[in-house]
A protein has these predicted regions:
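Eukaryote-biased RCC1-like beta-propeller repeat architecture
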Residues: 105-552
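Extracellular repetitive beta-rich solenoid segments
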Residues: 3, 21-33, 49, 53-107
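Short, intrinsically disordered N-terminal pre-domain segments
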Residues: 1-17
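Short, surface-exposed beta-strand/turn "edge" patches of beta-sheet domains
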Residues: 40-48, 536-537
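Disulfide-stabilized extracellular beta-strand modules
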Residues: 31-42, 414, 523
Length: 552
């Protein structure tokens, strides 16, 4: 027994209620899980429950309220009540009646990334200048960093240290794919297959039938005189490099190819060198399965048809059209020379002054300028203006966007190989020598993707493995390797991401002003590298040496 004294009032705890016992005022007993205080002396044989003249509830327990494991007890306003356990993944929230209920987690619109800019893919040989972004879980688009020429699409030119929502207008169905070129224009294919464009438009590359810049996205698919009017857009092809004079191509679901913008070297494929301010269908080619553009201004264009035929046109000063000459072509011409003879082509890739074609047997063919760097990987440093076979068992090809050309190839066995410019050992040559032969990068045989960053000799590489880990090597003066410092690496090192899993990687920036992006499988995006114009989202513009979360 115990006595609780509250000044002039003393309660004596008598334990569990017993019907034969005599109780006096201030005696406390437990009964059916609750506690009661006796109100009348000499109370015998009167149970506490429902006898308010003899007993008063002293402290309510949970007996009669809850009986199942995992139930939660709450005050319903007049009594205690039990809430059954929720299901896995549910969270406790407040219902419309003000009482606790189980519900689905309330994820705020756009709080997670689900897809990076298409510049992260091998389809776009381009590295955006001090800016990046992606598509969110609500299908909106967020971007940050340098905002020259309204490229962030938020209506002004202020650099942003945090992701801002691109200001699409009425009729926008949500983003499917987003592209930006080096420093001028942005493009988005919406979920309905319509094309939106914004930014600088001095060459008519926005496809809006004028040369007026756009501060926010405009629907180019609604231009009735445009060749993409009424069509479903599936891909946008932007040029690489840093030279301006912008051209763009658009691939539609029906296999037609369309072009707009600068045309000084016939890169629009329309039979002349006249600029186009709206999209015009490219003649000759049909049922196009893949298309690419080379460098800005001095642009070569390529298309692969579903039947395996390869076409090229445009600038040819470096022999990148693959016809054995350096003469430009203003209209698409099928290429069957050299080792392409009799081959069915499945994909095409291009670099600064060279091109690569993958045939349906996994053989890789290359052509273009090769002196100094050996970027064709053909075993020598001689130019090859007609295609030569350079590798077998190839699954994918990765090139850098401008000078000091190098190339990585991922083979069907999951290994990664490098050739070309050896600056900072990005090509895999530890001594930093240029290499005309492909050499294996020592990171095993589970590579799923690679990327090459930097221009002006500041090359570096990332490689994503099947288990979600990332290796990095090459130039690291601003921490873009994400390994915690600014020391260059001549051999691949593991990026410290603890036990987390990366599902996609990207590189952006030019020269030594580079950044890397790491998209995790939970939708979080982290970046490392250069901080100018808030390229890495750092408010103070400092470089960041380890992957740092992008704060929304």
């Amino acid at each position: 027994m115990g006595t609780v004294s509250l000044g002039k009032i003393a309660f004596t705890y008598k334990g569990s209620y017993a019907g034969a016992s005599t109780y006096f005022r201030q005696d406390v007993v437990s009964f059916n899980g609750d506690s009661y205080v006796c109100l009348v002396d000499n109370t015998v044989g009167v149970a506490p429950l429902n006898n308010p003249t003899k007993w008063q509830l002293f402290a309510q327990g949970t007996a009669g309220v809850t009986s199942a494991a995992g139930e939660l007890v709450y005050n319903s306003g007049g009594a205690l009540a039990a809430l059954a356990p929720g299901a896995a993944g549910q969270v406790l929230t407040i219902g419309a009646n003000g009482l606790p209920v189980w519900g689905t987690p309330d994820v705020r619109s756009g709080t997670k990334f689900k897809r990076l800019l298409e510049n992260a893919s091998t389809k776009v040989n381009n590295r955006p200048y001090r800016r990046f972004g992606g598509i969110m879980t609500d299908n909106s688009v967020r971007m940050w960093g340098n905002n020259d020429n309204y490229v962030l699409g938020d209506g002004n030119t202020f650099a942003r240290p945090y992701p801002v929502r691109v200001a699409f207008g009425p009729g926008f169905a949500g983003a499917a794919k987003v592209y930006v070129d080096y420093n001028y224009s942005g493009y988005c294919i919406d979920l309905n297959g319509q094309l939106w464009s914004w930014g600088y438009n001095g060459y008519g590359q926005l496809g809006l039938n004028d040369t007026t810049d756009r501060r926010v996205p405009v629907n180019a698919s609604l231009i009735a005189s445009s060749s993409i009017f009424g069509k479903t857009v599936t891909e946008v092809i932007v040029a690489g490099g840093v030279e301006g004079y912008c051209s763009v191509m658009v691939l539609c679901a029906d296999g037609t190819l369309h072009s707009a913008g600068y045309n000084g070297y016939g890169q629009l494929g329309l039979g002349d060198t006249t600029q186009r301010n709206q999209f015009v269908q490219v003649p000759v080619v049909s049922n196009v399965a893949a298309a690419r553009l080379g460098r800005e201004r001095y642009t070569a264009a390529y298309a692969v048809q579903a039947d395996g035929k390869l076409y090229s046109w445009g600038y040819n000063g470096d022999g990148q059209l693959g016809d054995g000459t350096t003469t430009q072509a203003n209209i698409p011409v099928q290429r069957t020379g050299g080792t392409l003879s009799g081959k069915s082509i499945s994909n095409v890739y291009c670099g600064h002054t060279a091109a690569y074609a993958l045939d349906n047997t996994g053989r890789l063919h290359a052509w273009g300028t090769n002196t100094t760097y050996g970027n064709l990987g053909c075993g020598n440093f001689a130019n090859q203006f007609t295609p030569v076979q350079v590798a077998i068992g190839v699954a994918d090809v990765y090139t850098n966007s401008y000078d000091y050309p190098m190339v990585l190839i991922r083979k069907t066995d999951g290994t990664l190989w490098g050739a070309g410019a050896g600056n900072y050992s990005a090509n895999g040559n530890v001594a930093g020598n240029h290499a005309a032969d492909f050499a294996q990068i020592p990171i095993g045989n589970t590579v799923t993707k690679a990327a090459i960053g930097g221009t002006g000799s500041y090359n570096y590489c990332l490689a994503l493995l099947q288990n979600g880990t990332v290796y990095a090597w090459g130039y690291n003066g601003n921490g873009a390797l994400g390994v915690g410092d600014s020391t260059n690496r001549t051999t691949p090192v593991l990026v410290p991401i603890a036990l987390r899993s990366v599902q996609d990687i990207a590189v952006y920036g030019t020269s030594s002003e580079q950044c890397s992006a790491f998209l995790f499988d939970d939708g979080q995006l982290c970046v490392a590298g250069y901080g100018g114009s808030y390229a890495n989202t750092d408010n103070n513009g400092n470089w960041i040496g380890t992957p740092y979360p992008v704060i929304l």
